[in-house]
Amino acid sequence: MLSIIQRVNCANVVVDGQKVADINKGILALVCVEKEDTHQNFEKMTDKIIKYRIFEDEAGKMNLSLADINGEIILVPQFTLAADTKKGNRPSFSSGCPPEIAKEKFKKFVDIFKNKYDKVQTGIFGADMKVSLTNDGPVTFTFKV
């Protein structure tokens, strides 16, 4: 399981001209489920994102988590994170999870996340999404669990 998280002042996702997710201060997370991912991976990634201290405290130190600031999050499915880019000039997705399986795994991940944190919105799996954000910092991290 892969994720890129970005600290944002605001972010939104639009599909077919309709805003499907819209947050203020929090995290925009691009999330990729892989073939071998299990419930344990989903739990670990959820805990990592919720507890990772990327927000500044009163001293200006990155010492507060999403939960600490009561921030919002958008989970955006992003299968291209699993691309093999080592050879040539075109990404390979041969090791990726088939779409129907990936969609179900992403749903399970979102369900786990929503059970642990209540300010969760999502993009739409398989949709052509327009993602907008105001990055704060920028502060961006990559996770693999």
Curated annotation (Swiss-Prot):
Gene Ontology MF term list: D-tyrosyl-tRNA(Tyr) deacylase activity; Gly-tRNA(Ala) deacylase activity; Ser(Gly)-tRNA(Ala) hydrolase activity; tRNA binding
One GO-annotated biological process of the protein: D-amino acid catabolic process
Catalytic activity: glycyl-tRNA(Ala) + H2O = tRNA(Ala) + glycine + H(+); a D-aminoacyl-tRNA + H2O = a tRNA + a D-alpha-amino acid + H(+)
Enzyme class: hydrolase
GO CC, any one term: cytoplasm
Entry keyword Hydrolase: yes
InterPro entries given in the database record: Daa-tRNA_deacyls_DTD, DTD-like_sf
Cellular location(s): Cytoplasm
A Pfam family per the record: Tyr_Deacylase
Enzyme Commission code(s) on record: 3.1.1.96
Keywords, alphabetical: Cytoplasm, Hydrolase, RNA-binding, tRNA-binding
Subcellular location, principal: cytoplasm
SUPFAM superfamilies in UniProt: DTD-like
UniProt short sequence motif Gly-cisPro motif, important for rejection of L-amino acids, positions renumbered to this chain: 137-138
Task of the protein: An aminoacyl-tRNA editing enzyme that deacylates mischarged D-aminoacyl-tRNAs. Also deacylates mischarged glycyl-tRNA(Ala), protecting cells against glycine mischarging by AlaRS. Acts via tRNA-based rather than protein-based catalysis; rejects L-amino acids rather than detecting D-amino acids in the active site. By recycling D-aminoacyl-tRNA to D-amino acids and free tRNA molecules, this enzyme counteracts the toxicity associated with the formation of D-aminoacyl-tRNA entities in vivo and helps enforce protein L-homochirality.
Domain statement: A Gly-cisPro motif from one monomer fits into the active site of the other monomer to allow specific chiral rejection of L-amino acids.
Subunit-structure text: Homodimer.
Family, per entry: Belongs to the DTD family.
Protein name, per record: D-aminoacyl-tRNA deacylase
Native species: Francisella philomiragia subsp. philomiragia (strain ATCC 25017 / CCUG 19701 / FSC 153 / O#319-036)
